[in-house]
Amino acid sequence: MLSKIRQAKDRILQLIAFHVPGAKSLRVRLHRCRGVKIGQNVWIGYQVLLDTSRPDLISVGDNVIISVRAMLIAHFRGPQGITIEEDAFIGPGAIILPNVTIGRGAVVTAGSVVSSSVQPMTVVQGNPARPIATCGVALGEKTDMGQFLRSLRPLERPSTGRRN
């Protein structure tokens, strides 16, 4: 019975957090009440979905940005979890799947589906998300975009054997 009450409470808090303003205040507090471990100075965008059944399996470090409509799915059949380390950026509509660690300062681009861990200071893109660049500066709330873009170093793509 207590488990059912907790599940109902978690879903109600998720629904409220999904719609209310307060990316750095109210949403963060609501998700903490659900059991998500959230560091300091975290920004959670509008309509972000953090695992509805096992929010306690999600850990978010300091200075993380989770953009609008991102989804963090922390488990399928067993406790696996998601860890987002400090200074990471999760782009709009990105999906983070279970048993993944997003490294310090990593960037997940918009719409990417992350099914394996991301190295620190790495930019990933696509479905499934693949590394496309390294970055010398974390993409934070106050980061100058020009400075971030200048710090990017594209990764070499493996040869496909095709001629252009």
Predicted regions and their residues:
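Extended, small-residue-rich solenoid/repeat segments and analogous flexible loops
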Residues: 2-50
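C-terminal segments of enzyme domains that contribute to small-molecule binding surfaces
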Residues: 79-90, 95-96, 127-164
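Structural signal for interior beta-strand "rungs" in well-ordered beta-sheet cores
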Residues: 31-32, 36-38, 42-125, 129-131
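Arginine residue identity/basic-tract feature
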Residues: 6, 11, 24-34, 54, ...
